[in-house]
Amino acid sequence: CCGPTACIAGCKPCC
């Protein structure tokens, strides 16, 4: 779940 919209998707650990 990482990518340009990771934070928006709620994948905080991926930020």
From Swiss-Prot:
Domain of life of the native organism: Eukaryota
Tissue-by-tissue expression: Expressed by the venom duct.
Alphabetically ordered keywords of this record: Amidation, Disulfide bond, Hydroxylation, Secreted, Toxin
GO cellular component assignments: extracellular region
Ranges that cross the membrane: none
GO molecular function, one term: toxin activity
Disulfide bonds: C1-C15, C2-C11, C7-C14
Keyword Disulfide bond found: yes
Protein's UniProt keywords contain Nucleotide-binding: no
Coarse class of the protein's main subcellular location: secreted
Modification sites for 4-hydroxyproline: P4, P13
Domain comment quoted from the record: The cysteine framework is III (CC-C-C-CC).
UniProt similarity note: Belongs to the conotoxin M superfamily.
Name of the protein this chain belongs to: Conotoxin tx3i
Source organism phylogeny: Eukaryota, Metazoa, Spiralia, Lophotrochozoa, Mollusca
